[in-house]
């Protein structure tokens, strides 16, 4: 019987599927190995235990979010780009809840792979905000504000805190409109 070959990328894709399907509590070396059809010991050639898997998944998920956002705003500018960014951010969080949660692992220091992945997300926000007139530190401050507002909405939505009869889509449109109208143009 031939041994099944695995690599870090396939492991992280399986780990992402596990957390997107059942949350962080479902993530284990055994669960990922089972999904890949290998013995758990095979994973240790690529990761440093469960802590390494969690950290590598955070980098993978943060990179995925950055790519998702960049794809949404390419060839857009101004408030159109701001709206596309907000919609894509919410969509990623809704379609990939486990990966979105994994992006919240704080980067330990600048220059490491997780810090660099977080910087890529900030760069997308800063580029979009440059198209509406923000530069330098001001762009970073406004990026934090916009991201915080969107993160707050999607976090409340994820825990089921928006249960009234008032339509969530309309609320999100209000949020986007408020953010867009508050920005320089």
Where are these regions (language model features)?
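Amphipathic alpha-helical packing segments from all-alpha helical-bundle domains
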Residues: 108-144, 166-181
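Amphipathic alpha-helical linker/stalk segments
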Residues: 59-84, 115, 122-127
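Amphipathic C-terminal alpha-helical segment
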Residues: 148-165, 180-185
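Amphipathic alpha-helical segments used for helix-helix packing
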Residues: 92-112, 123, 155-163
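Hydrophobic alpha-helical connector segments
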Residues: 70-99, 110, 119, 136, ...
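Alpha-helical DNA-contacting segments of helix-turn-helix folds
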Residues: 19, 53-61, 103, 107, ...
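Generic hydrophobic, amphipathic alpha-helix propensity
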Residues: 7-16, 57-61, 65, 69
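Helix-turn-helix
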Residues: 10, 14, 18-52, 56
């Amino acid at each position: 019987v031939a041994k099944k070959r695995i690599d870090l990328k396939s492991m992280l894709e399986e780990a992402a599927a596990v957390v997107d399907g059942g949350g962080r509590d479902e993530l284990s070396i055994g669960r990922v190995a089972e999904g890949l059809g290998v013995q758990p010991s095979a994973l240790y050639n690529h990761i440093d235990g469960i802590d390494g898997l969690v950290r590598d998944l955070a980098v993978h998920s943060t990179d995925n979010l950055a790519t998702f956002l960049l794809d949404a705003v390419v060839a857009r500018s101004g408030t159109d780009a701001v709206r596309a960014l907000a919609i894509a951010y919410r969509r990623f969080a809704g379609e990939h809840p486990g990966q979105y949660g994994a992006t919240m692992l704080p980067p330990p220091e600048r220059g490491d792979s997780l810090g660099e992945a977080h910087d890529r997300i900030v760069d997308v926000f800063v580029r979009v905000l440059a198209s509406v007139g923000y530069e330098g530190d001001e762009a970073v401050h406004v990026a934090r504000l916009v991201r915080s507002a969107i993160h707050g909405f999607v976090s409340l939505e994820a825990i089921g805190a928006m249960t009234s009869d008032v339509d969530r889509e309309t609320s999100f449109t209000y949020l986007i409109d408020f953010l867009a109208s508050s920005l320089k143009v």
